[in-house]
Amino acid sequence: MKSAKKLLSVLCLGIFILTFTACDMVEKTPEAKAKSTIAKVNGEKIQRKDLDESPSMQQVLSQIKTQYGEEFEKSEQGKEVIKEQKKQILENLITEKVLLQKGKELKVIPKDEELNKEADKKVNEIKAVYNNDEKKFEETLKSTGFTKETLKEYLRDQIVIEKVINEVTKDVKVEDKDAQKYYNENQSMFTEKPNTMNVSHILVKTEDEAKKVKKRLDAKEDFAKVAKEVSQDPGSKDKGGLLGDISYSDSNYDPTFMKAAIALKEGTISNPVHTQWGYHIIKVNSKKEYPVKKFDSVKEDIKKQLKQEKQQEAYTKKIEEWKKASKIKTYEKNLL
């Protein structure tokens, strides 16, 4: 099972790894179900087997079996969960089909010899994950529903998709001034060591409650005592509201909460801060802040990051445009 997961994670790693003739109701055989049409994209069919055999679907089924057991997918709840997952994966397969069609239109598909060479290189990279153990590699292929031939065909498609994406994003550029602006606005991200702060908070439901809490704290009542009395955060209430050390870049906290906390000076308490959880009174107990790296030492990293973001935006905009212009029809009744 671990080997299978390893291969699936390799195949599903890239940002753009996306992986039924309509049947009459009387067709109940596995073969007929596999060939049933689940979508048409500009006249080209996507069959149920394309979805069921995709790495994404295999990974979903593996996770479901690990989490809920072998029988879960046969239950009504399991079928509903799987159907929702299939709908998401089908959307990816439709995107993949549009990209492959555009590959022909844009004339970016390499000749077979070159395409096979690139696919073989990727196969060898996957084999390297298994220390080039051919037996283990073949066993894993079998357990994930691949043969050497179908794996290579899958990789050929992914190579074409990469080339389409490269064509769409080839003109994206980032200037030094863009990097400088980002650096100036986000200097806490470029310190010699990550900046951290030790934070406590009191969480209440309403703004009026928060104002009353702030008034008590302004009157010099003990923060921890008030937190234990009124805070509605079960994770920190009994600790006097203490959240502990938090990195300035920690994405586990609400962005509004983080912005307010970072803006506070050491030892100070905020006014009420509204987030999705309610109203917070935040106290920064201490801070550890480090010198900011020189712009020239981080410029290229910033430009690389900004370029990737712009490429993603350009790709997303283009694929939405292409899909909107395509004739797409789905047949959700054939998903199960």
Curated annotation (Swiss-Prot):
Residues 194-286 form the PpiC domain. One of its GO terms (molecular function) is peptidyl-prolyl cis-trans isomerase activity. It catalyses: [protein]-peptidylproline (omega=180) = [protein]-peptidylproline (omega=0). It is found in: Cell membrane. Residues 1-22 form the signal peptide. PROSITE patterns: PPIC_PPIASE_1, PPIC_PPIASE_2, PROKAR_LIPOPROTEIN. The keyword Cell membrane applies. Plays a major role in protein secretion by helping the post-translocational extracellular folding of several secreted proteins. NCBIfam families: PRK00059.1 (NF000809). This is Foldase protein PrsA. The gene is prsA.
